[in-house]
């Protein structure tokens, strides 16, 4: 073959000078071995050094395209490069001056020849090996006759399968690999999580000094207390509820049974709730009692509100967050959509107490979430992974958390969040209150509940998670081991008469000993333990199923998975190693709808297991004997973690809570500082930042809630007076005092905590009529009407008949008569007003309005010609803050009333009032400054 094509005496490499394989020839040109000898030696492992560069074949040049030996097998064709566009490097001729300069370059020059040569040596070595492999394949293919290349060659699909066989992990991200895949009901694998977040490191709670907190706020309503046991069963049956656990609270059937205060009830009514859902009827009393709960209900059953409402009350009892504090309540849910939904509910109900909520979930801005957490929020709604990220980055901490909720726990387990959920629970203080909600109650959820809940109450709504109540558990407490043998021999014949008996022992040696002893007593029985051959075990199980042997003595390992419906009695001769094993043991009976009995024999040394057994019995709605409970109480950890019974804490006694916000309605009877009014929390708690921080917004919210909560139609006020709080307070639709009959008015004004005075005292700068005390009276509904109604209220209290006349006179003379009435109110009730200012400490709460009850300051504020100030005094006159001052005001007005004739001219009354203002009224009050002449004087 001519290798010198293209020019005389010039050696050319492959791929140059027209070398091609003609398609028509039968004999394909073979690649002779000696044709590679020219460069085969140079392509040894020693590489191509600087000593012999001319021997480099042209297709091994840097950046050049390798030769295409076979068009059908373009093995080394590089499709990304085009040989026509590649600039080949310049290599000077041998013995040329340029070549000599190239060799004479110093070693430490800036050129990068050394790394390049090392790399090229490796590339050329690999290329030489590939060339040899290609030649061998060509030889093998040429030697085989009658084989079609198009069939034998590897196509795309075969290449893909070969590649996947060689690289089983190709394309699989390492984080997505899961050893244990979960499968859904159809048998399809559930996709694992996209990202595994390392759980939080373990924490030693004994080194942290946690402040105590209160969990129990539930006081049972008398209607629920009076229910008989049968009525209670009927109520739960009507609500389709099944409740199990130690001493569960009775369910309520209306919102009145929960004892919520007016702020929260206002938001509940606003959310269009008419009555609680079944899960709320039982779940809210459980959560208010401070008990741990497992709630099993379908989506849409109202379980979200069932843990949000008690959460708000739980938070309100604790002290306010300080800078750097973490949340008080944490709600963990599986998906960001559910997280946003629960966050919206928390915001809706939390604004009743100005509580802040933050949603923390994957996919949201990490920086914004961290900023919101650092500003402080009482409630955090989160997904597990993102909360762990924030805790690791010190954006928040879990030290203040005392209310922990896991919503849709089964979905979190399906998504692979088990370790994260457990690490979050382990980072929260051990004496927390934990609520677990799930749509199903699989074994994993049951195990989690046992690990993170203490004495939980299980509330099942609907037909989900049907508890197996076919097994009756009986616990026998015996003095010693021999007592067990006596008990067994005495009762075994009785048990075998009703069906097959399965005896459990813990160890193999004990099983053999017990079986031998029973055989000596004449009992026909079988033995089953882990060291037996499979054939022997199969024969024993077969005989037991056929009822050839009525008694079977077995260990735990051998008995797992036994499904024999004829077993009527299970006897735990030795207690199980743990409660899981115990559950498996007793599950051997009561199968396929058959009833069964499980006996457990305990001795005094089994106190550790007794605690677990008590909780297992309570969870299965089984009777717990006093002897068993006493034995369990000998165990220190059970005694310490056991729930405490008793009545719930009555809130608002002596203040307390976030910013000492008053909480009327939760059993509050006597209050030292708080005032029983709906709006008091707006006054007491103002966040430093946020929408509710400024006073104008607080006043708007106060007015809105005041009008909506205390609306009473004017025509119905006389009928409802004294029968309801709103009627007794005499509020009209405008928020001002209404004219009420004598008895009810006197009763309302003499009671220590009248809703009128309390509602008026709720907001700084508000008088009894619902107006701002320092503002001019320009609204007829809240100003003039308030004055007229107040006057008529005074007349009705004094017992005179001048009510109609006065109201008529004030209504006709809107100008001067209003002014004179303000002076009269000042004259009549200076004394009680000054006493109130010192006693009730309004100045303590709001220094800017502390002198609202001082006479001099009030007169000094007559920027509007004295009108506003005097009307404010009139309001102050009616606002007797306690029993004494009201009586003083009442007596004083009774004495002064004969001097006030209904038809006195307003100008004369003005003069009289101006004189009486200057007289001493028994208090060391500074002389009021001279009043400027106002337009009312004319």
From Swiss-Prot:
Its EC number is 3.6.4.13. Residues 820-920 have a biased composition (Basic and acidic residues). Residues 116-157 form a coiled coil. Residues 284-459 form the Helicase ATP-binding domain. Residues 1-114, 182-203, 737-938 are annotated as: Disordered. Pfam families: DEAD, Helicase_C. Expressed in several cell lines (at protein level). Expressed in liver, lung, tonsil, thymus, muscle and pancreatic islets. Residues 70-84 have a biased composition (Acidic residues). Residues 738-833 are annotated as: Necessary for interaction with TP53BP2. Residues 737-757, 786-798 have a biased composition (Polar residues). Residues 487-632 form the Helicase C-terminal domain. Its main location: cytoplasm. Belongs to the DEAD box helicase family. DDX42 subfamily. This is ATP-dependent RNA helicase DDX42.
């Amino acid at each position: 073959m001519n290798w010198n094509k293209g020019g005389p005496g010039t050696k050319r490499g492959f791929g140059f000078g027209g070398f091609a394989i003609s398609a028509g020839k039968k004999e394909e040109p073979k690649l002779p071995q000696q044709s590679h000898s020219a460069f085969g030696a140079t392509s040894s492992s020693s590489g191509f050094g600087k000593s012999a560069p001319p021997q480099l074949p042209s297709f091994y040049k840097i950046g050049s395209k390798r030769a295409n030996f076979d068009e059908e097998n373009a093995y080394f064709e590089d499709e990304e490069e085009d040989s026509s566009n590649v600039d080949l490097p310049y290599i000077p001729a041998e013995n040329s001056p340029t070549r000599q300069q190239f060799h004479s370059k110093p070693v430490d020059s800036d050129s990068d020849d050394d790394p390049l040569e090392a790399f090229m040596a490796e590339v050329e070595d690999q290329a030489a090996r590939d060339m040899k492999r290609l030649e061998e394949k060509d030889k093998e293919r040429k030697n085989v006759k009658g084989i079609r290349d198009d069939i034998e060659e590897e196509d795309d699909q075969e290449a893909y399968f070969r590649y996947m066989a060689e690289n089983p992990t190709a394309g699989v991200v390492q984080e997505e690999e899961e050893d244990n895949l979960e499968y859904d009901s159809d048998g399809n694998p559930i996709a694992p999580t996209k990202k595994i977040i390392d759980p939080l490191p373990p924490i030693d709670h004994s080194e942290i000094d946690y402040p105590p907190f209160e969990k129990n706020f539930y006081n049972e309503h008398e209607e629920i207390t009076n229910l008989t046991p049968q009525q209670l069963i009927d109520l739960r049956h009507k609500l389709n509820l099944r409740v199990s656990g130690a001493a569960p609270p009775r369910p309520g059937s209306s919102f009145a049974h929960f004892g919520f205060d007016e702020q929260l009830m206002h938001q509940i009514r606003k959310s269009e709730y008419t009555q609680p859902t079944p899960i709320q009827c039982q779940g809210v009393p459980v959560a208010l009692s401070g008990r741990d709960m497992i709630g099993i209900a379908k989506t849409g059953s109202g379980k979200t509100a069932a843990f949000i409402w008690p959460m708000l009350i739980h938070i309100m009892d604790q002290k306010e967050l300080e800078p750097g504090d973490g949340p008080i309540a944490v709600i963990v849910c599986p998906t960001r959509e559910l997280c946003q939904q629960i966050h919206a509910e928390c915001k809706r109900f939390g604004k009743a107490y100005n509580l802040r909520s933050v949603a923390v979930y994957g996919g949201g801005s990490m920086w914004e979430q961290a900023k919101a957490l650092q500003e402080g929020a009482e409630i955090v709604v989160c997904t597990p992974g993102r909360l762990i990220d924030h805790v690791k980055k010190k954006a928040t901490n879990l030290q203040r958390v005392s209310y922990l909720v896991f919503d849709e726990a089964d979905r979190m387990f399906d998504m692979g969040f088990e370790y994260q959920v457990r690490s979050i629970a382990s980072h929260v203080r051990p004496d927390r209150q934990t609520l677990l909600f799930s749509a199903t109650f699989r074994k994993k959820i049951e195990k989690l509940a046992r690990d993170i809940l203490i004495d939980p109450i299980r509330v099942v709504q609907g037909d989900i998670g049907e508890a197996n109540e076919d097994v009756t558990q009986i616990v026998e407490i015996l003095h010693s081991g021999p007592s067990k043998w006596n008990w067994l021999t005495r009762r075994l014949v009785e048990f075998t008469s009703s069906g097959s008996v399965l005896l459990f022992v813990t160890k193999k040696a004990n099983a053999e000993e017990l079986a031998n002893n029973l055989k000596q007593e004449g009992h026909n029985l079988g033995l089953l333990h882990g060291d037996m051959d499979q054939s022997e075990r199969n024969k024993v199980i077969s005989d037991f199923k056929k009822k050839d042997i009525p008694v079977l003595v077995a260990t735990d390992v051998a008995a797992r998975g036994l499904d024999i419906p004829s077993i009527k009695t299970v006897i735990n001769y030795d207690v199980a190693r743990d409660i899981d094993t115990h559950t498996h043991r007793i599950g051997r009976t009561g199968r396929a709808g058959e009833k069964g009995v499980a006996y457990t024999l305990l001795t005094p040394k089994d106190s550790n297991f007794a605690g677990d057994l008590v909780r297992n019995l309570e969870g299965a709605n089984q009777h717990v004997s006093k002897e068993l409970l006493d034995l369990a109480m000998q165990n220190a950890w059970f005694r310490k973690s056991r729930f405490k019974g008793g009545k719930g804490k009555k809130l608002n006694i002596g203040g307390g809570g976030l910013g000492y916000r008053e909480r009327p309605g939760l059993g509050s009877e006597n209050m030292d500082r708080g005032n029983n009014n709906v709006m008091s929390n707006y006054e007491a708690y103002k966040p430093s930042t946020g929408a509710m921080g400024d006073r104008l917004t607080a006043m708007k919210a106060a007015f809105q809630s005041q009008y909506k909560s205390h609306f009473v139609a004017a025509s119905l006020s006389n009928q409802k007076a004294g029968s309801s709080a709103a009627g007794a307070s005499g509020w009209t639709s405008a928020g001002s005092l209404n004219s009420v009959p004598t008895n009810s008015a006197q009763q309302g004004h003499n009671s220590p905590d009248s809703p009128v005075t309390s509602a008026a005292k709720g907001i700084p700068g508000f008088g009894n009529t619902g107006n701002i005390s320092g503002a001019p009276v320009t609204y007829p509904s809240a100003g003039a009407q308030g004055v007229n109604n107040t006057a008529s209220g005074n007349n009705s209290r004094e017992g005179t008949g001048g009510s109609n006349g006065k109201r008529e006179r004030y209504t006709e003379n809107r100008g001067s008569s209003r002014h004179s009435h303000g002076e009269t109110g000042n004259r009549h009730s200076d004394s009680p007003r000054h006493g109130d200012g010192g006693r009730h400490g309004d100045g303590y709460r709001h220094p800017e309005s502390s002198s609202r009850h001082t006479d001099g300051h009030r007169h000094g504020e007559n920027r509007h010609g004295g009108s506003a100030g005097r009307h404010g005094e009139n309001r102050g006159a009616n606002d007797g803050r306690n029993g004494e001052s009201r009586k003083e005001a009442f007596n004083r007005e009774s004495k002064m009333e004969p001097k006030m004739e209904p038809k006195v001219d307003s100008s004369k009354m003005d003069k009289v009032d101006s004189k009486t203002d200057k007289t001493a009224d028994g208090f060391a009050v500074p002389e009021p400054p001279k009043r400027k002449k106002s337009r009312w004087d004319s």
